[in-house]
């Protein structure tokens, strides 16, 4: 999801005990020696200079597909991915971290680093009930609890910020400190009867105090951090604080959130196109990213949560006006509409991402949440129009400018499948289930199986360089997130779907029957 520099201001489940794994899905995996390895083949290097022919990018080209014959096909693929991820595991006295490139700083983030991999192991444990997977999750969480401040070290902060081209992301909730906090919250809720739960709770609350007492700056109406409203930046920090408040309770924290919300509202701008715009790309940039990670879709989502926890109608009204802006910039397709990746510049209105970061897999979460708070048919209409627009571009089977040769959770099919499974949980529509399953066919079809039985996914990380493929392990950018989606599809096919969700994920945990 690498983007140009925005110029933003830079700042330095299922509950079970540690001794008893859940058997909700009755697929206890006892011997993971069959699905893990200690080496990785030479072909699994981080960067690949030449794309396999079936994953080379051509607009309109079909993605490789493989249709699952039964639910176990999804589980086996996820377990093969775990085997590959495990080859990058590093044990320390304080726990486990995962790292592909030893020449780079240790990546602790939810997005692409160890916190995201630990989150995958949480999900793998919930589904399989395997005690060794649970131990890996606990050890990964323990390392994150001990080392989250490492993300603030100059070398690590620069690594995160420069890789994404956005100063300040090391403070945010995806690539920074807040994302580690979100995973620690999930760990505390999952291992509720374990002595480790208290460790994770304390670390998550320490991250909360870092945001409230150390890194916050004072604006005209309240505190802020980076000065960008993007969910990747201040918006995501606020989502973490809301999750922290709702999980552990703290009236003083709620008052802080209210003050930060007042400051956040100051960043709204009346758009000449209509509605209200929150431009996370920065007010000095000549362009605007309107979707979930950086734009008004993500800001509207945060405002909906602020309305939900405070009852302050100002947030609901501005969220509605964010939707007005998105409606104003949406571009009609042969069917439905799509919101462009970017407003302004030579490619304005021409590229339509379909993933989480700048596309429907993320943006659909905004009308979904609003539909639970605001009794207006417009939210269901928005969901259907965006889904129609995606299919009009040939998704999920065909490549396009905004769905290039990528399948990861951030930009591709793993994120789309997750969102459409969430929509299926709301209304049980066969359409949503079928769309998710079609995405699953592509995840299986694009999987690269190695001689040792492990599996990875070669895909292009950067849209502007589709010839450069990599095989990554992270949650948003690699195998951990893809494998997590495969676990969801496994549960769906077994008619036993259950998925505890983070705060950026507004869908029900279970399908409504």
Locate predicted features.
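Short polybasic linear motifs
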Residues: 21
């Amino acid at each position: 999801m690498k983007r140009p520099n925005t110029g933003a201001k830079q700042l330095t489940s299922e509950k079970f005990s540690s001794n008893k794994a859940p058997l909700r899905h009755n697929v206890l995996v006892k011997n993971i020696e069959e699905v893990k390895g200690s080496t990785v083949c030479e072909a699994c290097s981080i960067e690949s200079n030449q794309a396999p022919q079936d994953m080379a990018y051509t607009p309109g080209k079909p993605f490789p597909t493989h249709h699952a014959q039964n639910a176990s096909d999804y589980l086996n693929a996820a377990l093969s991915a775990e085997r590959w991820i495990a080859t990058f595991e590093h044990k320390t006295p304080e726990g486990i971290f995962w790292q592909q490139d030893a020449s780079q700083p240790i990546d602790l983030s939810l997005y692409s680093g160890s916190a995201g991999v630990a989150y995958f192991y949480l999900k793998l444990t919930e589904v399989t009930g395997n005690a060794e997977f649970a131990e890996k999750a606990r050890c990964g969480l323990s390392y994150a609890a001990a080392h989250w401040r490492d993300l603030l070290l100059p070398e690590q902060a620069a690594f995160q910020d420069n890789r994404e081209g956005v100063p300040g992301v090391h403070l945010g909730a995806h690539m920074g400190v807040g994302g580690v906090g979100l995973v620690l919250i999930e760990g505390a809720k999952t291992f509720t009867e374990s002595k480790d739960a208290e460790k994770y709770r304390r670390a998550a609350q320490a991250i909360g105090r870092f945001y409230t007492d150390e890194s916050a700056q004072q604006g005209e109406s309240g505190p802020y951090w980076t000065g960008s409203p993007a969910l990747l930046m201040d918006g995501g920090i606020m989502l973490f604080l809301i999750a922290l408040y709702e999980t552990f309770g703290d009236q003083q924290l709620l008052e802080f959130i209210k003050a930060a919300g007042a400051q956040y509202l100051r960043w709204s701008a009346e758009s000449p196109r209509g509605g209200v715009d929150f431009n996370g790309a920065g007010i000095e940039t000549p362009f605007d990213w309107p979707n979930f990670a950086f734009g008004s879709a993500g800001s509207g989502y945060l405002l909906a949560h602020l309305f939900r926890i405070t009852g302050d109608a100002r947030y609901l009204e501005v969220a509605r006006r964010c939707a007005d802006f998105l409606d104003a910039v949406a571009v009609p397709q042969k069917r439905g509409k799509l919101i462009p990746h970017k407003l302004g510049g030579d490619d304005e209105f021409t590229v339509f991402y379909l993933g989480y970061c700048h596309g429907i897999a993320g943006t659909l979460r905004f009308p979904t949440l609003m539909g639970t708070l605001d009794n207006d048919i417009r939210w269901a209409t928005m969901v259907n129009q965006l889904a129609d627009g995606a299919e009009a571009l040939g998704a999920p089977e065909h490549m396009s400018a905004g769905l290039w040769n990528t399948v990861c959770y951030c930009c591709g099919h793993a994120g789309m499948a997750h969102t459409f499974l969430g929509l299926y949980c709301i209304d049980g529509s066969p359409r949503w289930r079928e769309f998710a399953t079609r995405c699953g066919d592509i995840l299986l079809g694009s999987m690269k199986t190695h001689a040792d039985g492990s599996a990875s996914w070669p895909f292009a990380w950067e849209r502007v360089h589709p010839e450069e493929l990599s095989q990554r392990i992270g949650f948003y950018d690699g195998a951990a997130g893809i494998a997590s989606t495969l676990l969801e599809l496994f549960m769906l096919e077994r008619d036993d779907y259950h998925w505890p969700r983070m705060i950026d994920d507004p869908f029900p945990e279970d399908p409504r029957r």
